[in-house]
Amino acid sequence: GFDNAKYLQMQSQHIRERIAQFDNKLYLEFGGKLFDDYHASRVLPGFEPDSKLQMLLQLKEQAEIVIVISAQDIISSKVRGDYGITYDLDVLRLIDAFQGMGLFVGSVCVTMYTAAPEVEAFEHKLNSVGVRTFRHYKIPGYPNDVARIVSDEGYGKNDYIETQRPLVVITAPGPGSGKMATCLSQLY
């Protein structure tokens, strides 16, 4: 079967090596569920439902979490099917859960930013409790118009997310939130 302890040790070591390889800054897109990945534990016997979280906890002194959420998901009040809560409320739940485990949440990035009262209220709520917010904008032609994407009209328009730690974990309440685009924008 799957050796969970060996997995945690090897993955953590590999991430440390990557951080050193990339000038002490690594952006790591974390998709899927961090707290309760029962699907992975079903298809991979021996994989614990919280293995990803346990790996992060081994790196917590180096790690900073950035949570991304699409403006459209805020505006439409998109609901997580598993928890029955909206994505914006899930961001608040994730912040509390990460902080409760001793992990540092550096900021929240609103992706595909659109000015709307719901988005402004969400940003205000986060700022009022000390969570910094950043904005990434819609890029016409994304993902096919590479020349525009990697220009001042593309990633260059986005806020640069100021981070403090060498491992920046980009996560989100659900798929399609812009995790990978956020990583790429930071590199730009």
Language model feature labels by segment:
Residues 167-187:
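Glycine-rich phosphate-binding P-loop
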Residues 1, 158, 188:
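Glycine-rich phosphate-binding loop of ATP-dependent small-molecule kinases
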Residues 13-17, 151-163:
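Pre-Walker A adenine-sensing motif
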Residues 136-156:
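N-terminal pre-Walker A segment at the start of P-loop NTPase domains
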Residues 24, 164-168:
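Pre-Walker A (Motif I) flank of P-loop NTPase domains
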